[in-house]
């Protein structure tokens, strides 16, 4: 007996898992993990499945993290939020705004659960989670021991954290602590936000602008399955960026604190005239080249073949090799996404 994963991944790819367990508290989560381990089965914890591509049937247990709850503690200079890992991220952003606690508005409409946000160090429109993260509460899967990691201990990087490295498969995130400063500073560095006046802008206006940009440019997973940005924006050494800018002076580029330069993957893909290109049922989205969609009952093989095609075309034209932001899940767990599409 297997269970379809189609409802549990926003790509809408039809693979199955041996077991699917919905965990509403820590004990259920630990029990499901320990049961699978006793049976010698692989086990993975999933939020809303908005950043994964299942490559094949999963041979083990998928645990859906549904630990809920939001607690707010106000101090003189900040609001401190303690949020269950199974809460929906966008609903949290709305909750904070509705209660006059700004600071999350640039991250509106990012799909997925709160517990996934530190794994990827989610970011959009100039703000990353690390800017507001205070701590992450996890439970050690083998021992059931509680751990609280400070933001520094999470080792946040660009779409990266300790949870994608040493702590992968070792801990389950059960809650995230956020600190929203009362000295709100709007971040207006990207897209339509640059048109807003920092002196008069409200957090609600930033939220509305972000929602407008996302809904007009990004496909709704309920209509066309997708996992948001498929590729990371490449971060390259300064000399490589200089070389590229000599050939393409209008290429969007964002110098980083360490001297490297972040390029816009969507722009690179667009320059290769790849919008609308299809392989099987998978397609490059016509409005936002960074998004690959399930246009017509795509298989995971279609998506992988399309990602490979996009990577090759961009690499040949720019000598910049894109890496997936989406996590690839094989029969026994996560596999190397770059190798899968190389």
UniProtKB/Swiss-Prot annotation:
Belongs to the MurB family. SUPFAM superfamilies: FAD-binding/transporter-associated domain-like, Uridine diphospho-N-Acetylenolpyruvylglucosamine reductase, MurB, C-terminal domain. GO terms for cellular component: cytosol. This is UDP-N-acetylenolpyruvoylglucosamine reductase. The gene is murB. It is an enzyme of class 1 (oxidoreductase). Pathway: Cell wall biogenesis; peptidoglycan biosynthesis. Cell wall formation. It is found in: Cytoplasm. GO terms for molecular function: FAD binding; UDP-N-acetylmuramate dehydrogenase activity.
